[in-house]
Structures are given as structure tokens and as C-alpha cells.
Amino acid sequence: MQDLKASLIKVFGERHLVEAFGELTLIVDSQDIIKTCLKLRDFFYFDTLIDLCGVDYLTYGQSDWNGNASASGFSRGRNHQGSKDRHEQRFVVVYHLLSVSKNKRIRVKSFVDEAEPIIKSVTDIWASADWYEREAFDLMGILFENHTDLRRILTDYGFKGHPLRKDFPMIGEVEMRYDEDLGRVVYEKVSIEPNINVPRVIRK
């Protein structure tokens, strides 16, 4: 991995590369995503996109987060975070790439504007990005410019909003399901109470 890290630093610069927990993460400006991904594919042989998702940092570092917890076992230390630990930018698109021939992996992160979360599609670089980008659009509301079929992929017909956003309302919405007794589709009000079963941990 150190050889890959050194090569990436030569091309992209050290300040854009983060190494943590045995993984490399490349931070990329959204305007440079196509140029960067082409370099990763053509010069570093990352020929496979294995995952793409959106992340919402809206409540990152607020209540219910632990800042000091064991990385293994059952120990959980509690140290509530303050505003200094919150992300300056809200939405990020995360790409996980694999080089089959070199047996290397890398994560690419690109933050997008909160008011207009738009980034260019990478479907022309990796065809596997197609449904991943549709999922990120559906659940997070991130728009992928030049995607040829950017439709919802998981939510129901007529669904309003993007359900994985941290500010998505938990009450007042409706869901659709098939009622076997009535023999038709029905709409019911949704009321979901936030329930944290697994401690949220900020690892640095």
C-alpha cells in the first residue's frame, strides 16, 4: 500500500490523501471528479467500481455520538462531541474502487454543494455506477450530471423527498403497501421514532 500511496501523492498531492485503518482515501473537488477518476482507471488500473453512495453529515458530531470508544470488544466510552467536530460540508459522494490486476483498493470522496448537490456521472468510466448513482439520487437527492436514466430505483411511485437525508421527516408522510384483505394498494401514515441501537462512534 505504501507504494500506491507514494504514487498517488506524486500525482494528486499529499494534502488530498488520507491514510487510516489500513485504507487510503482520496479527497477530490467535485469539479475534478471525471479527470481524477480517469487517471485512477487509466494510470493506476482501478478498473472496477465496487460501490458508490452518498453520505449526509448534517448531524455528525452532535448528540448520541461517542468520540472515544473501543475499536474492538464490547467496551464503549462516551465523550459527547461539540460543534468543532461537525463537518463544514454536508453531502459527500463516496466511491470505492478496485484494481483487479494490482489487487489494490482506494476510496474517493467528493463533497458537493448542499443547496445544489450536483456532480458529474462516472457511468462513462465505470458502467457499474449506473444503479449506484440512481440509488444515491433516490435516497439522498444527489444529482448526477449526464446520467442517461436518473430515475428513482428503491422508493415507491410518487414518493416525495429523499429518505436517507438526516432531516427527512419521520412523521406526516405516507407509505404504500398492498392490503391482502382489501385486495388493493393502500396508503398509510408513517410515524417512526428514532431508535439508536448501535453506538455512533467518530474514529480518528
Curated annotation (Swiss-Prot):
Coiled coil: none annotated. InterPro entries: NADH_DH_suC, NADH_quin_OxRdtase_su_C/D-like, NADH_UbQ_OxRdtase_30kDa_su, NADH_UbQ_OxRdtase_CS. It holds the Pfam family Complex1_30kDa. The keyword Transport applies. Its EC number is 7.1.1.-. Keywords: Cell inner membrane, Cell membrane, Membrane, NAD, Quinone, Translocase, Transport, Ubiquinone. It is a peripheral membrane protein. Its main location: membrane. One of its GO terms (cellular component) is plasma membrane. It is found in: Cell inner membrane. It catalyses: a quinone + NADH + 5 H(+)(in) = a quinol + NAD(+) + 4 H(+)(out). GO terms for molecular function: NADH dehydrogenase (ubiquinone) activity; NADH:ubiquinone reductase (non-electrogenic) activity; quinone binding. NDH-1 is composed of 14 different subunits. Subunits NuoB, C, D, E, F, and G constitute the peripheral sector of the complex. Belongs to the complex I 30 kDa subunit family. NDH-1 shuttles electrons from NADH, via FMN and iron-sulfur (Fe-S) centers, to quinones in the respiratory chain. The immediate electron acceptor for the enzyme in this species is believed to be ubiquinone. Couples the redox reaction to proton translocation (for every two electrons transferred, four hydrogen ions are translocated across the cytoplasmic membrane), and thus conserves the redox energy in a proton gradient. This is NADH-quinone oxidoreductase subunit C. It comes from Ruthia magnifica subsp. Calyptogena magnifica.
